[in-house]
Structures are given as structure tokens and as C-alpha cells.
Amino acid sequence: ENIMQKFLSDLINKLGFVSSSQSEKLSRYPLAAPLPKQSTHNLLLDCCRDIPFYTDMGRMMSILGWDACRDYYWLITDIEGGWEAALPDPCWLTGAQLEQILRRHPNEQYIWAVFSAFAPDIAASQIDLQSLPSAESPDFWQDHAKPQHPQALFEIVCWDSTYTLFIGLPDKLAHRLVAAFPDCRRLKKL
């Protein structure tokens, strides 16, 4: 067993991969746990164990809870993927419609995208489409970041296949995320 561990460790180093124990040291952001007592949180998945790629929205919604996904309307913007996009850009969906699409296209990676959650009682005609969220907003990297769209409750951002950002995530959903990913980080200005 030790020979196999040494072999795998050497192979990982030669290929340039980072082991999960090393990945904890690479993130510049502080661990999220324990979460402070507050109504919303700005969180970041980077250097987490057990994540084959960071922008698998089906998996993220499953962890947050499909029930939560269905509780909101969703505006999806700034979509880019390495596949034939299942969603037009921009896209307005009920939570049930988003769930159906994400389940129909499992493990689909969004390289860039912003999933903005809206109250279930807001109509598409009431949404200001002049201020569409961008996945490359510099405001994410500031203390106390807020959802980009003025009417959004929170945002999930697929950032260059490297990170998944959660801006203004409600406390209940933040606890689910941190429970699933103990390596989850607090997003703050460094």
C-alpha cells in the first residue's frame, strides 16, 4: 500500500496536479466555517476537495436543494460553455424550468455564467433588462459584494471554470453549501 501511495504521489507531482491536502494551502481566502450569524453570505468554491469542476450547476443546485431552486425565478446571463448551450443568453426561467434543464443536461459545465435568483412573485415584465449581470464583474472581489442586478436576491456565478461564487446567499443555503464543502471559503477583498 505504501508503494502505491508513493507511486501516486510521484505521479501527481510529475503531472503538476495538487493533492487535496496541498489545495487547502493554495486558497488565499479564509475558510467559511464556522459561518458568522448573518442573513446572507458571500462564499467561494476554490481549491475544494471532491469537486471535479467548479461550475457544475446541476450539482450546485442539488446541494443547495432543488426545493430552494424551485422557490425562485432565475435570470441567467453571460453564458459561455464548451458545448452547445442549453440556455439562450439572457434567459428567464421558473425554478421548475431551470431544474428540468439542469437535470436533462447533467454535469454540463458553464465556463462563465451568472444565475440570478429573484422572488417568485416577480414577473418577467418587471425585470430591468438594462442591467444584465456579468460574470466578470470586478465588484465580486470587494468586501460586502452585492448581487449585480438590483432586483436579484442572490447570485451564483460560474467564473472561468475556476471558481463558483455565491453572492448574497441566504443563511440556510450557505449552511447547506458549507456542510457539503468544508473547504468552502468566505469571499472578501484581499
Which stretches of residues belong to each language-model region?
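Short, Lys/Arg-enriched N-terminal segments with co-localized hydrophobic residues
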Residues: 1-3, 35
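Acidic, metal-dependent phosphodiester-chemistry machinery of nucleic-acid enzymes
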Residues: 5, 12, 30, 90, ...
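Acidic, proline/glycine-rich low-complexity IDRs
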Residues: 6-15, 145-190
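Low-complexity, charge- and small-residue-enriched intrinsically disordered regions
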Residues: 10-27
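Short, flexible beta-strand-to-coil junctions
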Residues: 35, 47-49, 77-81, 118-120, ...
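Ordered hydrophobic segments in well-structured contexts
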Residues: 42-46, 52, 73-75, 112-117, ...
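N-terminal interaction modules that seed assembly of large macromolecular complexes
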Residues: 44, 50-103
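Surface-exposed, low-hydrophobicity interaction/linker segments
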Residues: 83-157
